Amino acid sequence: MVQDRKVLDALDTAKTQWYHFTAVVIAGMGFFTDAYDLFSISLVTKLLGRIYYFNPASKSPGSLPPNVSAAVNGVAFCGTLAGQLFFGWLGDKMGRKKVYGMTLMLMVICCLASGLSFGSSAKGVMATLCFFRFWLGFGIGGDYPLSATIMSEYANKRTRGAFIAAVFAMQGFGNLTGGIVAIIVSAAFKLRFDAPAYRDDRAGSTVPQADYAWRIVLMFGAIPALLTYYWRMKMPETARYTALVAKNDKKAAADMARVLNVELVDEQEKAAAATAAAAEEEAARREQYGLFSREFARRHGHHLLGTTVCWFVLDIAYYSQNLFQKDIYTAVQWLPKADTMSALEEMFKISRAQTLVALCGTIPGYWFTVLFIDIVGRFAIQLGGFFLMTAFMLGLAVPYHHWTTPGNHVGFVVMYAFTFFFANFGPNSTTFIVPAEIFPARLRSTCHGISSAAGKMGAIVGSFGFLYAAQSTDPSKTDAGYPRGIGVRNSLFLLAGCNVVGFLFTFLVPESKGKSLEELSGENEMEAEPAAATNSYRQTVPDSGQSE
């Protein structure tokens, strides 16, 4: 239908404006909160073990039993997976805006509830913590398809990749803030309630007030989400959803007039009657295939396979490293042995290590993607990222014993940081961006939800599997309660193999740089464009300014 074609053309050629940047902040703050909530748990798991699983007869500080640790670390991912599928589907059925506020409020409530976890026993506290973190993950899951879809549908085609990447890049600041908050909280508590090392005083090394420290860290995640709730509710529905799915061209153009300087003119009213028949015919053609149809499989089946597999294997590698950075640091002696520190000191040093990696390896990679994705393209960045991640992981794994010898620990951390850099300046960003671009509008949120859910399945495999796989091959050196594993070195080989799989499946995903969403999804092929309405719309800014 020509009206929505004109709406979409106006969106694709619209000049980059202030509202685009506002949308990045509004959508990006959700990802800031997402990253903070998902990664902050790794900063406090050692502290949880010391508080709730203390054994005065043990020579080592208390630690979470394997099943409890797996649940605490992985339950939010289970919720995220479910949320991605549910809210992705709901975003296509009800509209992006209507669902957007639900996810944010769920995140706020469950952030606060996680910090208020209660119970008369250690199991009780862990059970309530896991319950609230599951629903926290459920809300976080909804943010993935909705934020990506909203940003892709607002942006013009020349800078669309950079804007979606900027939304995702807020994860880096979420990680960094998680580390900074944990550093401040642990340092403040340590200053006020200093304690001896565990080997000097087993019971006294964990002060009772430490039970407040982890709660404060988890609850802080509610603040940025709460601050952006009002602005999310003020965002209009995306014009692409209104025009292509709700089929209300007049409202789509009116919404654009509010935020993107594009308005409806009287001629549209005159053209509406003349194009009604064409609109009905086109609508019927658009609805001729659904997600599970042969036509979808023919047009987009290989695309969906590529996006899901790439995100799945990427998250196995990415999240297993992120969640267990502290274990790798300990293995190379970058962190002191646990019994030489008090509980709060251990939390401080774990947080400091994660903050350093976020600052040096994580954040730069995200913003390199923002700068180069509309120049180099999605395909090249993803392919190169998988290749270099493989190379650096093999560089860590092959001479692993060299890296663990005295004097080489800094080199290990540098290599490890480069692995994160090329994950973020690579597939960790592009696997989020591409599914928001290549599928039809009526299935865009659903397909992004499916792709991101595959990623979270990989995160579950990484977070649960790595707990066991990375244990030492020497039974005497495993963590309490864990069976013998394959060791960190062999685990790195496995993760490198995952990256090779991602490299190969990248070839199923099309390049989307510089193309309109309708061109990528094939919706252009199904459009009838009556000549009578070619001038239905006009832009309020001069044509000469629409070069971005």
Curated annotation (Swiss-Prot):
This is Probable inorganic phosphate transporter 1-5. Belongs to the major facilitator superfamily. Phosphate:H(+) symporter (TC 2.A.1.9) family. Keywords: Membrane, Phosphate transport, Symport, Transmembrane, Transmembrane helix, Transport. Residues 533-548 have a biased composition (Polar residues). The gene is PHT1-5. Coiled coil: none annotated. The keyword ATP-binding does not apply. It comes from the Eukaryota. The chain crosses the membrane at residues 24-44, 70-90, 99-119, 124-144, 164-184, 211-231, 304-324, 356-376, 379-399, 406-426, 450-470, 491-511.
